[in-house]
Amino acid sequence: TPVSRETMDRCPGIRLIAVMATGYNIVDYTYAREKGIPVVNVPSYGTQIVGQYAVSLLLEICSHIGYHSETVKAGKWEKNPDWCYWDHPMIELYGKTAGIVGLGRIGQATAKILNALNMKVIAYDAHQSPQGAELAEYVDLDTLWARSDVIFLHCPLFPETQGIINRDTIEKMKDGV
């Protein structure tokens, strides 16, 4: 349930807003701060699984795992004239560059997995940390758009980040990113 300015005004005794998730973009954070109401979240909730899921989606796009699983079950491999069955070109991730926008907990979890795949990891984050610097090379956004073969968005949805992928940023990206 969103916690808007109106909601806070209807609850004059509110002393704390605790969001049971990783982000708090459902809260009018600026207004809460103006009223002196702390806003907290559960920062480590889902960290590892979200990173794992993000990379799983990339692996599906690159390897067509679901499609190949279904076609093997349907007998296409058996009907293949040679021992090698694949029905779509696959994309090898080794040596490719992954760009991560937002290198907080989830971005770092994602970076660890991408590093294990021997990908070059670059990242943009307004709040650079030593932990993040061990996992990725910090770059500005224009560099990230230009150098990345794949891009992950692990940033909160704020007015500054809404629409971050748009015509202008897409024009700065490699073809096929």
Predicted regions and their residues:
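An N-terminal-biased, well-structured beta-alpha scaffold segment characteristic
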Residues: T1-V40, A146, N166
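Residue-level detector of anion-binding/catalytic polar loops
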Residues: P38, E60, K120
